[in-house]
Amino acid sequence: MITHMVTPDSTSSAPNSPYGEDTIKLNSSVISSSSPVRSTSYLQNLQLQQQFSQLQFLQLQQQQQQQDQQLALQQQQQQQQSQSQQAQPYANPYFQTPIDQLFQFDNNPNSSFNPTRPPNIHTNQPYVSPYLHSAPLTNHSDLQPQPPPASLSDSELGLGLVKQQQDSLPPQQQAQSQPTPLLNQQHPFYNEYINDMPSTQHPYLIFNNTNAAHSTTSLPNLDAANPSSILPQSALNQSEYYKVTNGSMSNDPQPSTFLYNLHNHSADLVMNNDLEFSNASFDSIGGVSVSAAATGAGAGAGDYSHTNITSNFAQTNLHSSSQQSGVLPPPPSLPPPPTSLPSQQSQNQYLDVVPPQQLTNNALKTEANSPLITDSANFTTSQPQFENTILEQSPIFSNNTILSGIDEPSKEKSPNMLNSTLPLSKSTPHHIYQPSSSSSSHVRHNKITKKSSLSRLNTSSKKNLRANLVHSLSTPTELDDANNNNNDIVTPPKTLSPLLRKKTSFINVKKENDIDDSHDINCKNFSIDIDDMDDEDVLSDFSQPPPPIGGVSNDTMRSLAPVGGVGLGSSGNITGYRSLSNASSTSSHGSHHGLPVMNIFRHNPDSTKPSTPSPILSTASSSSTLSNKKVVKKLRGRKSKTKMNKSSIKTEQVVNEEPQVKNYKDDNDNDNDNGHGHDHDDENGGVSSDVGTGSNSTPSTTTKGKKMKLNVDLNNGGGSGTGSGSCSDENTSGNGTNTNTDSTSTSNPMVKKKHTRRRLLPRSKKGCWICRIKHLKCDEVTPICGGCAKFGLQCDYSSEKPAYVTDKILRQKKLTEVSLIRKRNQAKTKISRKKSSNDITND
């Protein structure tokens, strides 16, 4: 029963409607139109209309395509005729460029990128590039191609229409209607990159060129006389093969400026007509006639030639390119192999002015180990610059040759070198006579030495170099005989000049001691002859030759530290040389200003105090009775270390000075075995004769007060009445010292070093007690754990904690017992490698 009248326009139910509140009512017209009968008929009518329209569209499209194909064929014929008549084939501004090729698929939704496959290598069919015929796009901002202007001719207008119509075609029909380009077309944009070759119109020329593909890898092509090696040539001319068009429209053959590097199978361009001789053959290059003389032993003689290059082009182009690049032009033809050295031509370029100087007889007498001036630390050359340039250009000087003569003009222009007090060594300095980079190869077998740097050599580690310096400064090496005919080299005096005498400074001696603290003393069996020494003469005049070395055996000659560099005998000859061992490590360190080297002993390492300019050999003159005695220094050993406890030392300075003095006492032990004693006149004066003996050849860096204090401490602690004592006193004091050290070592045992645990956490909480006291991680295997089984131990798995776990003493005993068992077990297993049977029995 309907209780409410529903109007046709009502879309919602009334409040009292039996329908729900969400019910929506529709009009009768809507209901009738949405009936299933009427909806199906309506859809059928729509489908019929769409099918009819599609059929009409397809018919129209097919007709249009047929018309377009006919028009395209006509326009192709007209295009060929017009292009054959035109001088410039690319007068059409609407011809497509590679930039247009990038946009052709974006602008045409019907076309897709479908390039054709390049032909095989052995085919001679002309290749049609897919990049040469698509619709032109002149304005890239507008996605639609613009129509050609009205000023164009009918043929060009038709060509533009054909191009536009082809864009709307599918890609299959478009590929069919593409006009085939002429074989002699030229493309301006491609001319900068790719050769315009008719049969190989593709960027990857190496894969399409028949000649290039055959010639790069086939060696039989080298034989020009063999007709079987001649491969089938393609349709292109050899004269046009290597022709590169540079955008010019002229048809004249141009000289090639780009060559393809066919050796590495790439399109790399080689500039400046450089022919790649690494190529296997010349067949890939057009216009090249190769004879057997250029290719190998097989055919006639002659040089290769190119048809596109004129006779005078090679020389003119090479000279022009060499002027631009700054490199000398190579010869036009390959010269025969040179019979002389290859570096003689480069020598002649630089040594035309300076004639090569021949070696003299004096150069052959040069000793190989003669000291060099430039090997020293303080050598500075005062020669003018032009001498170095002349000497560096000469290739005949090696490291050990002698400059036979210097030009007279250079001698006159260098008075500093002639008047210099530094002696001119006849051995060649490295940085002056270093062979230049263009020197001949017969000099290069010599050792190449680095140019000496004064800042690098001015260190305390260059011991031998400074020794050579003093040798060259004090007494120059006599390399020439008495009948020396070369008078152009000034021989310096054998003694130092007064200028060097004034530069005497004992601060250098202080530097000596500063550096010597870090060096071990390795000097023994040193002998001094100081009979004829006078301290006043030595201090006043350094021109006196240093004392000679005498009384030295051949065995001890190797480790000598000489007194003054080179000792001069009575006849003036060289009687000894400086030792180059560690004993004379820095004895010439104080001679930075050309000072003569004193005989310096490093007995007092206290270098914190400044040195006092006390007389060097004053104590030596007071103890003149020690004329022919030997002062022997031994290495620091156990004996000197055990005797450090001989005296009760209270200050740190005495502790630092004591081991050096103990060495002298050890020396006196060896020297006094024959019953000879020393004078002790100076004993109460503060300096014992033993200490004086040590300081007779060195400037003492401590005052006499320190030596008195040292002597008093030695007398009080030694138990004997004298500082050095006689033979019996020294022996008794030495024995007492040994007993004291032994007693102190037994009474005060060494504190055992604490070792960290060999295994960190996690430690075993349930393992055997042996692994727990050894701080090892036990694997908790119940019969016997792995650690105990490895070393043959008895595993302890007792439920209660053993006593050796809590008690330290018992634990130490248990650990020692375990270690002994472990060592025995390891000795049994590893007896062949490490231990012998005697060691096992001793264990």
From Swiss-Prot:
The keyword Transcription regulation applies. Residues 768-795 bind DNA. Residues 102-127, 416-427, 451-462, 645-654 have a biased composition (Polar residues). It is found in: Nucleus. Residues 630-644 have a biased composition (Basic residues). Disruption phenotype: Leads to attenuated virulence and defective hyphal extension in a mouse model of systemic candidiasis. Residues 1-20, 102-155, 164-183, 318-348, 401-470, 580-759 are annotated as: Disordered. One of its GO terms (molecular function) is DNA-binding transcription activator activity. Residues 659-683 have a biased composition (Basic and acidic residues). Its main location: nucleus. Residues 580-589, 610-627, 692-703, 725-748 have a biased composition (Low complexity). Keywords: Cell adhesion, DNA-binding, Metal-binding, Nucleus, Transcription, Transcription regulation, Virulence, Zinc. The keyword DNA-binding applies. Residues 328-340 have a biased composition (Pro residues). Component of the RPD3C(L) complex. Component of the RPD3C(L) histone deacetylase complex (HDAC) responsible for the deacetylation of lysine residues on the N-terminal part of the core histones (H2A, H2B, H3 and H4). Histone deacetylation gives a tag for epigenetic repression and plays an important role in transcriptional regulation, cell cycle progression and developmental events. UME6 controls the level and duration of gene expression in the filamentous growth program such as HGC1; and is specifically important for hyphal elongation and germ tube formation. This is Transcriptional regulatory protein UME6. The gene is UME6.
